[in-house]
Amino acid sequence: MDYRSLGLKTGLEIHIQLNTRRKLFCHCPPVLRDDEPHFRLERRLHVSVSELGAVDPAVMWEVRKRRRYVYEGYRDTTCLVELDEEPPHLPDEEALATAVAVAKMFNAKLFDEIHVMRKTVVDGSNVSGFQRTMLVAYGGRAKILGYDIGVETIALEEDAARKIAEEGKTVIYRLDRLGVPLIEIATEPMTYTPQQVEEVAWIIGYSVKITGRAKRGLGTVRQDVNVSIAGGAKTEIKGVPDLSLIPKVIEYEVQRQLNLLRIAEELKRRGVGRVEPSLVDVTQAFANTKSKVVKRVLEAGGRVVALKTPGFQKLLGAEVQPGRRFGTELADYVRAWTELGGLLHSDELPGYGITAEEVREVAARAGAESFVLLMGTDERELAEAAAVVAERLNAAPRGVPEETRGANPDGTTRFLRPRPGAARMYPETDIPPVKITFEILRKAEEVAKASIEGKLAELTSMGLSRDMALQLIKSPHLEKFEDLVAKYKVPPQQIATILLNVSKALAREGVEVTDEKIASVLDALAKRVITKEAVEEVLRNMKAGESAEEAARRLGLLRMPYDEVKKVVEEVVKAVGREKALGEVMRRYRGRVDVEDVKRAISEIHF
């Protein structure tokens, strides 16, 4: 795919939890807990205009869902700030210093005075209905590993509450994560390829990680990707779970926008008119149905209704992403707005146990060959679903709508809500402006000394090639490598090879290489009990509870003493000559002799 000719532009928003002693706006510890909560409370959110007199469209979208929110907390690690019953405390200075340090890494312009803002969030993940956020710096640019990275903004904000469960219209959150300091780095629009965007995301994430102030573990880093193409629209894709998924997410979003533009062109060519949200009851068409999907609704006292979609024949079933069709997009809207499980459409019928005869009956009753079927017991939900489907269909001729979408595990995306507007952000009235003091700058200078290039230089000085050093930095093994180098007198390059190459090769064979096995092998190498050539075979064959030395003895792979190596080399040199001796000795005694010992013995032989 020629992304440049398509006008692909991408942007990243990288969110990283900071490892601080307290939360951002209170003094509770930022720890996640799995024990039974001490209390639960219930809240409902209601729409109101912001201090600027406007209502955000994303707010209207969420509030219309009429949801009930339950919050779980702990008396010893949750306070009234999280419950929105006490004013927030002053921001954590440690978190602020880290944000300033990251700004310096990317040469961003710092604000002399930082104002705390409220960002409207009404999915229930913030008890107050807003997230507190501080814009720390803007307009940064840095060249790292050959990439020119423009940073639009660097913000410090509080993380949201943790979703525990969702049951119908009730969503259960836990307050332990609410308020954990989170740094957000938003890039300028980029014209890089999807694979290059993944690299940029890694660089940004590691630049924060290398400060030593970032939390580690699952869920501590979250990536949002903004994607647009010429003629399309800016789409924000939330929660890409893994860096390696970024290229696929971008590729599939480009496909989706291209396909939506094709659908728009076809609708214009057909001269399709407005879809009205009026419903036709077609329940009688399924009086004797064998479809389990339909029978389940009818047995619960529900009904089946049809929404006429004239002019959409063969377009409802048009693929927009792998395994996802335009009808799937409509079903996403229904699920996002209502409690209905989705919809069926004429392009996928007969199917789901619905017969061709039943389809003809529905078409006759609806008075249309193209239609959407909705099923349920709640009349209000059916009407809501019809309205949202009609609204999306009427927007289809205009091309790609601006949306916030969620990333699926396979790289496709689903609709979450409309893109938020400017009315989403307004000033926090409970916290005075925060000045960047000399003390904060001093702390930031210390943190900002770390860099990717600095870490590469440190690793290459140990004898690693630049490629191996970069591979190690990108792997999850860097900390382990540094610990092992400090503990064992083994060349760092050998340790890196075991962690990066040998372990991976054995894992492909189904061999589990534990930390204990690696430690035992390094101990044997340090004691000169085995050679580096024997490492893979020893790891492959180590039994449970067996040391590397014991395994090597059992396998006949104990390191040959140097005196024996000299004797062997003398014999081989006599037999095949000095030039061929190294290869011949290594072939005969592979795993038992060290190549450096053989080279030394050859150099010491004089006939």
Curated annotation (Swiss-Prot):
Top-level class of the enzyme under EC nomenclature: ligase
GO biological process, one term: glutaminyl-tRNAGln biosynthesis via transamidation
One GO location term (cellular component): cytoplasm
InterPro entries recorded: Asn/Gln-tRNA_amidoTrfase_suB/E, Asn/Gln-tRNA_Trfase_suB/E_cat, Asn/Gln_amidotransferase, Asn/Gln_tRNA_amidoTrase-B-like, GAD-like_sf, GAD_dom, GatB_C_1, GatE
Keywords: ATP-binding, Ligase, Nucleotide-binding, Protein biosynthesis
SUPFAM superfamilies cross-referenced by the UniProt entry: GAD domain-like, GatB/YqeY motif, Glutamine synthetase/guanido kinase
Catalyses which reaction(s): L-glutamyl-tRNA(Gln) + L-glutamine + ATP + H2O = L-glutaminyl-tRNA(Gln) + L-glutamate + ADP + phosphate + H(+)
Gene3D superfamilies: GAD-like domain, GatB domain, N-terminal subdomain
UniProt key word Ligase: yes
Listed Pfam families: GAD, GatB_N, GatB_Yqey
Residues covered by region (Disordered): 399-428
The enzyme's E.C. designation: 6.3.5.-
GO molecular function, one term: aminoacyl-tRNA ligase activity
Source organism, top-level taxon: Archaea
Cited function: Allows the formation of correctly charged Gln-tRNA(Gln) through the transamidation of misacylated Glu-tRNA(Gln) in organisms which lack glutaminyl-tRNA synthetase. The reaction takes place in the presence of glutamine and ATP through an activated gamma-phospho-Glu-tRNA(Gln). The GatDE system is specific for glutamate and does not act on aspartate.
Self-association state and partner proteins as the record states: Heterodimer of GatD and GatE.
Similarity comment: family membership: Belongs to the GatB/GatE family. GatE subfamily.
Name of this protein: Glutamyl-tRNA(Gln) amidotransferase subunit E
Protein source organism: Pyrobaculum neutrophilum (strain DSM 2338 / JCM 9278 / NBRC 100436 / V24Sta)
Gene label: gatE
